[in-house]
Amino acid sequence: MLAIISPAKTLDWESAVPNFTFSQPHLTAYSEKLINICRQLSPAQISSLMSISDKLAGLNVARFEQWQIEHNEQNSRAAIYAFKGDVYTGLEVETLSRDDIQFAQQHLRVLSGLYGVLRPLDLMQPYRLEMGTKLANEKGKDLYAFWGNIITDALQQAIEQQGDKILVNLASDEYYKSIQENQLGVKIIKPVFLDNKGGKYKVISFYAKKARGLMCRYIIQHRVTDIEQLKEFDLGGYQFNPSSSTQTEFVFKRDVIK
């Protein structure tokens, strides 16, 4: 079983990182091509392209300039410790054990606009490049065209190593679109998290993102390798709802926010 999550816009380069043997990202030759394209853009162009402030554009221009193809502990940080957002609030990586992280290294992947696919302990440098960015490149008008089947192939290799051909999609639609689903040839399970609001169950973005992190944490801590085990997820007050679920979409509902 392999689970996928999205990265986060906000980065954490401050908190302590445990001493691990870190791994190298596999697709940096492609990352370098994207960096070289981004280096040709002015701060104003970056601001417009990414819909960010002039200040953030300046920061990211500097990041593109400073990026190096060599990744080491001086210029990089392990991916699982580098992102800080709603999903990662649910994941609470700082409370996971060393054995948990080693399990995650085999069973979790972070999709990335710049790096394609990252393992938890893969080193990465600070960047902002969302998968939905319309960055023109040699392959087309956006990052979906750029990555083509590269991300799909990388995930396929990782899934084959698991031996069970199961992918748990905990990524956002923006990132999941980078995968060519029909070429994967695996069973894909999509957990959906609904909260009771005014008597109706709805996807509430903030809570759903955090729940995806909670599910990721559950998979790691319980060493989940079987689809049926996913249904036992109960963190944050969510419960599996069989009547609303299908064979590929597992619905979890919550009445009281915890």
Curated annotation (Swiss-Prot):
InterPro entries: YaaA. Coiled coil: none annotated. It comes from the Bacteria. One of its GO terms (cellular component) is cytosol. GO terms for biological process: response to hydroperoxide. It holds the Pfam family H2O2_YaaD. Belongs to the UPF0246 family. HAMAP family: UPF0246. This is UPF0246 protein HS_0482. It comes from Histophilus somni (strain 129Pt).
